[in-house]
Amino acid sequence: MRLGRKKQATKFPQRMVNLIISGGLLLALSINIAACARKDVSELVTRKPNFVLEEFFSGNSVAFGIFEDRFGNLRRQFKVNLSGKLDGNRLVLDEEFLYDDGERASRVWTIDRLGLNAAGLVSFQGKADDVKLAAQGTQAGNALNWQYDISLEMSGMNLNVHFDDWIYKQDEDVAINRAFVTKFGVEIGSVTIVFIRGKTASTLWPLSLDEWPSG
């Protein structure tokens, strides 16, 4: 899932803004990006262990993550408490975040399992206050791919960006999330998150979100 935000656009560093508004750089990079499209989730249909989104996130879980710019520079760190409630084909997932600069944030996802798509893969639709329209997700094998647009606040400017969001289940209680952030088809950053649930998370949940560790 995506890193949470307050019910407002999210703040990002000035360097990121300069990268995005640099027209010459956008033009040069767009050619490379077009040639390096990521795989389709259907290619992972034989991967194990099988990932069932609503089962994995039902109950309490925790997460640890980082945000990097497109050059691989670490920009932010964060940790998350998650609580999921399943009602039929609908999962309501409450996320509470703490960032390393002390910012607190939250998001509530409402995720509906839609059934099988034309390719025979399980599809989902997700909604949250700061996600434009609805996120569209497809699950195959050990993976889930989300596609959605979101508004980020970057040095005083609101910028609409796209997220290509991938979750890979590693074992019963662990999944890894990689999300790629693009603007005009150009990658401007990425997010890496480790989700921990079940018995593995029972000794960690809830994480302290009062302040970021200083030592």
Briefly describe each language-model feature range.
Residues 44-60:
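N-terminal helix-cap/turn-to-beta initiation motif at the start of protein domains
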